[in-house]
Amino acid sequence: MEYGKAWEFQRDLFRARSQNEIIDTFLILQHPPTYTFGRRSQAGRCILSEEKIPLNPPLLKGESSLTPPFRKGGVGGFDRSLSGEDIEHADIYWVDRGGGATYHGPGQIVGYPIMGLKEYTADLHAYLRMLEEVMMGALKDFQIESQRLKGYTGVWVGGEKIGSIGVRVIRGVTMHGFSLNVNNDLAPFEKIVPCNIRGVRMTSMSRILRTEIIMPEVEEGVTDHFARVFDVKMERVSNPLQPCLV
């Protein structure tokens, strides 16, 4: 799903969940090539063509406008230089989540929980650890032993990052989520400083196991471990915006 459409869908779900019109929802998606920059993205060098200005989100009620560190044809946002060809083949979004820069693309699983956080934990840091546990459990299903790295958010294998997290909680409801590298091309990460961590090297399940991974199997594992970690029963629905009965 194109990132902008997924973002708009998230925000529709957020509004409905905030008003208790729907129950908690967990989206699992893949995106076409997309760079996103969170609220903690550091300034650096990037030349943006007039046609590829980073896109801003529609505002939620009570939000102030975002001021992205980009200016057309100038400097800002990226910590490394993106060529015109790079920009031409990827969308660019300045988003309202925490964290810095990241890349999404085919072969990467992205999970977006839209949930009332207090039902699971009152601690945002505990929530981040729970998302890490979901990814670590899914990796273990494929005999990949992963770890947390002290001082950083996300999931690591042998010092290389395989899972990233960037979230936002508004009035107790979560948005955004995590990404797990499965079969995706890792080269685009070299054009940015992922998650503001200089010198970080990204990896993927297929790179570690040296074989193509069956995506539905990983998606099933992520879903199962999400249910385990958050102690919920998962049910697939065709329209999560359909009001629930309370």
Per-region residue spans from a language model:
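N-terminal lobe of the biotin/lipoate ligase/transferase fold
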Residues: 1-61, 66-156, 161-162, 191, ...
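A short beta-strand motif that forms part of the nucleic acid-binding face
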Residues: 41, 169, 196
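Conserved phosphate/anionic-ligand binding catalytic regions in large, soluble enzymes, centered on
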Residues: 102, 109, 173-186
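Short, structured patches in soluble enzyme cores that scaffold and shape functional sites
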Residues: 113-116, 169, 180-184, 206-209, ...
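Coil-to-beta-strand transition motifs
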Residues: 160-162, 171-173, 184-187, 200
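Beta-strand scaffold of nucleotide-dependent catalytic cores
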Residues: 164-166
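C-terminal accessory segment of soluble enzyme catalytic cores
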Residues: 186-246
